[in-house]
């Protein structure tokens, strides 16, 4: 689910003035997005769920990890890195990747730490799920693959990771596509309470704060994840086969530890690592994103998410927002692969 939004929304709800200003910027961005300047009209049409597999996955050592990733398109094409969320995996992009490859992009789709066949190189490494650690993983992967610059695109955890990369390493990011917009938060912003109905939507983070929650997620991780899928995308009639393909990624031996630490860290209930302190300090200031960006939102997103006007002024470079209609929920790339791929191609042309 769009866990990243939790603390960001607390930050945005606390600033009504920001929302008013952002609304004006957001309208400008949306108009530009629909102005016909894009060069992606010839993307091949594809029905969601057309593809069910990637080519053989690859592995590479990168920083603290041995990363498992899918690859598509020409190796010398402009790079695109697609980043999944929780509880999802690389199959969120199984239809997006071939669309981008058909446009000549070199597409990399990694399993994040704690997912799929991605593994820590050392048993001594802290199983740390804090946001800056995940973003650092992707920079390390780019280094390992000798990718100097890429478009980064994602949703949920992946959207937040992409946002963080764009803030901390803008020189490595040619462009950004982020579902639900600006997802950068901090432990401090997480201390701000929300109205009761809003807090209710985050039931799972309070559950994860308990030992019972950790044990429950471990024991019922597939049932738990399927429930999140259903809540976050209430109009998406995914099949058991579709879910099972992704759910296999949650069998990673570090999965539960990473997920639980991620949420406990956000609530200030778990410590991070000192080596990320300076990065988190920079992120806590909620800096603007300067790289060219397109943000997306599904019209049936069942996960809590901010209104686009609440974050539009956090993008100071070329920017557009697009609402994706047709019953599209939280997992935009899997539910609306053409729209997601179009955003990537279009931001490349900004």
Regions found by a protein language model. Name each.
Residues 2-20:
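N-terminal secretory signal peptides and thylakoid transit peptides that target proteins
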Residues 58-62:
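Short acidic-hydrophobic surface loop/beta-edge motif
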Residues 72-117:
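Conserved HGGG/HGGXW glycine-rich cap/lid loop of the alpha/beta-hydrolase fold
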Residues 85, 156, 334-335:
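Conserved acidic functional residues
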Residues 328-336:
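Catalytic histidine-centered segment of alpha/beta-hydrolase-like enzymes
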């Amino acid at each position: 689910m769009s866990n990243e939004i939790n603390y960001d929304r607390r930050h945005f709800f606390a600033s009504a003035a920001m929302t008013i200003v952002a609304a004006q910027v957001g309208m400008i961005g949306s108009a530009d997005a629909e102005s016909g300047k894009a060069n992606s009209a010839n993307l091949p049409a594809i029905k969601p769920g057309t593809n069910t597999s990637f080519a053989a996955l690859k592995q590479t050592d990168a920083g603290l990890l041995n990363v498992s990733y899918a690859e598509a398109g020409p190796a010398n094409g402009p790079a695109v890195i697609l980043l999944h969320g929780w509880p999802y995996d690389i199959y969120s992009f199984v239809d997006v990747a071939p669309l981008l490859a058909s446009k000549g992009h070199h597409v990399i789709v990694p399993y994040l730490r704690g997912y799929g066949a991605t593994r820590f190189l050392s048993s001594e490494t802290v199983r740390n799920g804090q946001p800056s650690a995940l973003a650092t993983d992707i920079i390390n992967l780019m280094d390992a693959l000798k990718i100097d610059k890429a478009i980064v695109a994602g949703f949920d955890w992946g959207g937040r990771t992409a946002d963080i990369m764009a803030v901390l390493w803008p020189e490595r990011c040619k462009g950004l596509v982020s579902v639900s917009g600006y997802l950068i938060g901090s432990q401090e912003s997480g201390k701000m309470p929300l109205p009761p109905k809003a807090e209710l939507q985050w039931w799972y983070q309070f559950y994860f704060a308990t030992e019972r929650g950790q044990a429950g997620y471990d024991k019922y991780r597939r049932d738990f994840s399927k429930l999140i899928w259903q809540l976050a995308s209430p109009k998406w009639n995914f099949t058991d086969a579709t879910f099972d393909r992704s759910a296999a990624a949650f069998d990673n031996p570090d999965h539960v530890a990473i997920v639980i630490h991620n949420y406990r860290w956000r609530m200030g209930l778990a410590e991070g690592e000192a080596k990320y302190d300076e990065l988190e300090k920079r992120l806590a200031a909620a800096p603007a994103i300067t790289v060219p960006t397109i943000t997306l939102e599904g019209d049936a997103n069942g996960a809590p998410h901010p209104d686009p006007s609440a974050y539009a002024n956090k993008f100071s470079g070329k920017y557009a927002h697009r609402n994706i209609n047709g019953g599209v929920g939280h997992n935009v790339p899997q539910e609306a692969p053409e729209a997601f791929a179009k955003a990537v191609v279009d931001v490349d042309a900004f």
